């Protein structure tokens, strides 16, 4: 199994290009099911999670065409009855469940294994099912970990989400695109990836708009047509490289940044002493400059527009060498402190009580062998390795490959001493 080896102490310089957002691409691929004709997705990130959902689509019966040279994906229409994806494949990734809404909308009946993904806490699919029930679908456990859903017809409804779940918002929204009448989702997720999915669906002929933050209205249509679409940039990958500049005290240029999407990340990094410089006539790039002294700060993760839980682990690595005490409160996922033990092995002083981590900054981290416990924790350990004394070996990097395209090559191009073995 591959490992990533980082020898710390190198300053970073140069520029890095950010990929399109994994968390946009996955629901967009699922949403392609709704089209009566083919869909072309540009700037496809070559990630393991993307390959997984493509495999799910292929097991449904779709004849996908991935152009790895041009980073494009063609999803042709399915001109036969869909098949059932294997349980083993679906359990690899939670986002596999995103095909449920589109499949019910288009075919009226479907069976799917309960999904998997990072083990970062309870993420029940009940919110998804509750929303689909409100549209007229019926679900049941059909044995061996499978969920069966069917609907003679879907009818628009007013749906209130108990929590602004991104996945539930996406699934309900896609199912409602071809429901009869109007669907209103209250307390809907507000993440940029939600808006991106709306723009994608509307480009196929859907009628979806955001009336106000947290309220989405869908007017059902008879069918959706083909489209060509380019997803938004990945704000979490951009944030990861921002932290890389901050933790190493380096100056780098990041290309492919929507600064509005990253506003909470940028705000907290500025509070910690990091500087940001806009580039004239280049709104999608930014220069990030870290300083020698990292200031301690407090962070509480929240649904968007709050500070993203997907950037919590990376910030913990940064604050582990801040000059003073910091507090991180994780309010989204209860198991997102699994990287703490690994950072402690490197010399970090972190105490956890429930959903709160108290971080006492130390002068230095020391390289050792650590394990990526999930996608973002793995990236955070690479960040820690960039500034640690000696050599850091990160194992279980298949987690990292789920969400970062050749992360070691991007860091090496910036001057880091990093390799995959």
Curated annotation (Swiss-Prot):
Cell wall formation. Adds enolpyruvyl to UDP-N-acetylglucosamine. GO terms for cellular component: cytoplasm. This is UDP-N-acetylglucosamine 1-carboxyvinyltransferase 1. One of its GO terms (molecular function) is UDP-N-acetylglucosamine 1-carboxyvinyltransferase activity. Belongs to the EPSP synthase family. MurA subfamily. The active site is at 118 (proton donor). UDP-N-acetyl-alpha-D-glucosamine binds at residues 94, 123-127, 310, 332. One of its GO terms (biological process) is peptidoglycan biosynthetic process. Pathway: Cell wall biogenesis; peptidoglycan biosynthesis. It catalyses: phosphoenolpyruvate + UDP-N-acetyl-alpha-D-glucosamine = UDP-N-acetyl-3-O-(1-carboxyvinyl)-alpha-D-glucosamine + phosphate. CDD domains: UdpNAET. The modification 2-(S-cysteinyl)pyruvic acid O-phosphothioketal is found at residue 118. It is found in: Cytoplasm. Phosphoenolpyruvate binds at residues 22-23. The gene is murA1. Its EC number is 2.5.1.7. Pfam families: EPSP_synthase. SUPFAM superfamilies: EPT/RTPC-like (SSF55205). Keywords: Cell cycle, Cell division, Cell shape, Cell wall biogenesis/degradation, Cytoplasm, Peptidoglycan synthesis, Pyruvate, Transferase.
